[in-house]
């Protein structure tokens, strides 16, 4: 019988419970079994190995527009070669070859008016699905002929019209004059459908990102603060897919990059090496198998004495300024005894590593004091003055861009030794090239007397000559003023020769033989050296080479492989 509110407990059950508790207490002092029991034949699966190549670089900052002077950098060249489509690319010997990834073909189809017809592949498209078409050609043409601070615009300014058919896949480009260098045009096409109406316009194009791409790789991460860019295989690319899953560009100091090569965290490096880092690489090579190659860029460091500046209109003042400079010392300061020290630039137009380069340097032996005196200046308080005003020059360089800032400070120091006062002005690159040096500003801008800036040759040296030293172009169908060259130089005595070289009426070599002596005498530019990077490659990164001239190593990244991956 059960009482209300309780239950009767049997004595036997209590005995069993006590026994169980004793057993549990006894077990609690025994060490716990191992978390992973040792089982014969069991293997631990390693962490997945990424099929990638990590490349150490000096910097990853933008802008990334390869068509602007402000965008010229190692990383811009690398990204453009992998992400943007081009009508032609450089072959191993530097000659242009049609890029069959983009085009079916391209040829001159009419002599009068001079017309080039491009046939675009039907399957060529941007990463957002939009077709690559005539509007991309039109957008680049319109911007290159009219915007300030662009690279080698002279060829684009010969184009008078662009028409299309077959849904924009057949593009006809009409020129005002014959243009033998037409193959240098329409490289690194940009997505017009995304950029033409974008906020900020051309000045903001590719400042810190790529809105769409059309190459073997696409951008996964572009993190400037962290100093890392991750490119991944573009699954939308219509041609042979890249062998790697990813290419990583990683910013570090050169000592940190050497450490990363030593540990294998980086499999390659592309850096503007100096004497110290060259020694570090030599030391590393004693214990680590590696290969190295010098990679010259399409960029020559130059000092411009700008006739556009009121204080520099007199050729004798420009001659005095350049004569006050020690070229050897400037080259040593800019190259820091790295690979570029062997690429001294003694010609005004063609860079040292390009076919057709011939040294033409003509030093002016006239003393600085004599030239300034002839220009009307007199010594005063350790300096030079004319009409009661001291000669004091502004020396500009793109802010944060080496070796230009270093060279600019050396220019200031050397001028001071001759009593010529100066100050260094470092300006954001977009502002320096797009406003201060273009001659198109509608508001007051800083007057730049001397500019330490690059001279860039994108493939057609005749266009480089016309762009750097030709007189300001005049296009009747453009309402805004066409930018002048960076120095503001114009000499009618050589202008016809410059135009004839551009249109093929005279050989470039003959034109340079006439023009370069005038350029040296006019003291407009003092070229110093060609910029060069150093490529370092470990055996883990396969098929990595210096690449075609001026294309850069990453132009071949679609064929790179990672050992054992």
Predicted regions span which residues?
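Detector for C-terminal structural segments
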Residues: 29, 34-39, 325-356, 369, ...
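Alpha-helical secondary-structure segments
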Residues: 54, 133-140, 170-174, 216, ...
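N-terminal lobe/hinge region of extracytoplasmic solute-binding protein
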Residues: 54-111, 142, 212
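Gly/Pro-rich hinge or "lid" segments in bacterial periplasmic/extracellular proteins
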Residues: 93, 187-242, 246
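Aromatic- and charge-enriched surface segment that lines or borders ligand/interaction sites
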Residues: 105-149, 169-172, 311
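Surface-exposed binding/hinge segments that line
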Residues: 119, 153-199
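Extracellular/periplasmic solute-recognition and catalytic clefts
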Residues: 220-230, 248-313, 319-320, 332
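Ligand/substrate-recognition segments at binding pockets and active sites
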Residues: 224, 378-454
